[in-house]
């Protein structure tokens, strides 16, 4: 009995490490092209900024549009098969970009890469929800999530050093990324357990009738819908920061190149300890999880507003640091843990895919809308205020829905 218990503990720890490394690999790809856009433009006969920017748009379009289908397939076929299939497509897409001699092939590669990545979120967090002890779940999700910050740093710094300082061809950077993805594919194959035949048979049997668990926890319950919307609002502010903060600091706050990079990286770097601390706090006081979420969201909204209202550079840096510490990176693992508690075990993959679909939709909306507002008004400040208002709105809706459900539960219990 002790051996079984030990094996189980070992497996959930392996999952946490492997899924964190998966995020590292994905975010290396996410950010590796951004610093070397000028080199890519030069190799393609100086195509326009809009055409270069569309590379990321194609990726996120495929990533978002495949979230829900991948969630359904994860529930049906299991995480291992979907991770292997997804990363295989991801590798092919990355190699297409590396070997491309024109913009069309790069767009096709971006679509394939985005589609391949789409299976990771629902696979990773349904695996952690199914295997990690509930008392450690939010902390485990925070460790998994921290891989994105590490990957972002490696991608931004690595491509800059290799291409700009060491004069490596930008295509070779993509070959390096593809090699990293191949390694991760091998790791998934060796570490992740496949879906047992007994589980498949049981799942097939369960499709004939709707379980009582699913009746109590539909994917579009009022509570889950409020979480989906809150996550959209949370991610809107984050992707506004990721996309437009460097430009805002340079054009409207007078930062120079080195300071821009430091300030932008600060948001991601300080997010890791914030996520680990608050997820541990959430695990320790599980009954107060909603209060932790509400507190973090309100402070994050205030910091988004203070970013543009700060009268000097010192206050601006304090606002950015606190946003990184208390914003999306901190609340992500707690929200993920909350979703895992509200959705039924059978539909975890679909629940997480819906959750991430709404969040990543903001990555498509926020950059474009901010650019439009900037063109019309000549400033990006109003966009930061809008993002803060969105976070407050999402938080209030979530608070009202959770309070209503709590009172309804108390009435039923006392009846």
Where do the PLM segments sit?
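Extracytoplasmic gate region of multi-pass secondary transporters
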Residues: 33-34, 222-275, 336
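Helix-loop-helix hairpin linking two adjacent transmembrane segments in secondary transporters
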Residues: 143-193
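Conserved MFS/SLC helix-loop-helix module at the cytosolic interface between two early adjacent transmembrane helices
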Residues: 65-103
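Helix-to-loop junctions at the C-terminal end of transmembrane segments
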Residues: 66-78, 275-287, 374-375
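Cytoplasmic membrane-interface "Motif A"-like loop-to-helix N-cap segments
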Residues: 76-86, 283-297
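C-terminal transmembrane helical hairpin of 12-TM major facilitator-type secondary transporters
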Residues: 288-335
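Cytoplasmic helix-loop-helix junction between adjacent transmembrane helices
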Residues: 109-150
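A late C-terminal transmembrane helix in Major Facilitator Superfamily
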Residues: 340-379
């Amino acid at each position: 009995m002790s051996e079984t218990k030990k094996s189980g503990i070992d497996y959930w720890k392996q999952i946490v490490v492997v899924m964190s490394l998966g995020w590292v690999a994905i975010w290396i790809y996410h950010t590796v092209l951004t610093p070397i856009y000028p080199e890519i433009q030069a190799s393609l006969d100086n195509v326009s900024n809009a055409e270069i920017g569309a590379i990321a748009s194609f990726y996120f379009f495929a990533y978002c549009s495949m979230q829900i289908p991948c969630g359904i397939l994860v529930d049906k076929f299991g995480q291992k098969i979907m991770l292997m299939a997804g990363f295989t497509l991801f590798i092919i897409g990355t190699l297409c970009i590396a070997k491309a001699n024109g913009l069309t092939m790069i767009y096709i590669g971006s679509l394939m890469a985005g589609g391949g990545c789409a299976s990771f979120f629902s696979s990773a967090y349904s695996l952690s929800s199914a295997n990690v002890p509930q008392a450690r779940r939010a902390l485990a999700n925070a460790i998994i999530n921290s891989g994105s910050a590490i990957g972002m740093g490696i991608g931004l710094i690595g491509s800059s050093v290799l291409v700009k300082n060491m004069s490596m061809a930008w295509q070779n950077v993509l070959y390096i990324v593809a090699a990293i993805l191949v390694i991760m594919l091998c790791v998934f194959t060796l570490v992740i357990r496949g879906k047992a035949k007994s589980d498949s048979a049981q799942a097939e049997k369960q499709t004939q009738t709707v379980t009582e668990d699913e009746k109590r926890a539909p994917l579009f319950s009022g509570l889950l819908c409020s979480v989906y919307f809150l996550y959209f609002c949370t991610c809107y502010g984050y992707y506004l920061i990721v996309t437009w903060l460097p430009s805002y600091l340079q054009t409207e706050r007078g930062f120079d190149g080195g300071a821009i990079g430091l300030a932008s990286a600060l948001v991601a770097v300080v997010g890791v300890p914030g996520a680990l601390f608050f997820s541990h706090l959430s695990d320790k006081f599980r009954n107060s999880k909603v209060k932790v979420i509400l507190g973090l969201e309100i402070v994050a909204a205030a910091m988004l507003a203070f970013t543009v209202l700060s009268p000097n550079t010192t206050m601006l840096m304090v606002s950015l640091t606190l946003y990184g510490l208390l914003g999306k990176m901190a609340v992500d693992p707690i929200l993920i843990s909350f979703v895992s508690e509200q959705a039924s075990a059978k539909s975890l993959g679909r629940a997480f895919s819906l959750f991430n679909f709404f969040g990543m939709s903001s990555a498509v909306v926020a950059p474009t809308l901010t650019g439009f507002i900037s063109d019309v008004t000549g400033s990006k400040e109003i966009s930061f205020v809008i993002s803060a208002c969105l976070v407050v709105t999402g938080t209030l809706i979530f608070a009202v829905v959770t309070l209503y459900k709590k009172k309804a539960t108390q009435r039923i219990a006392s009846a």
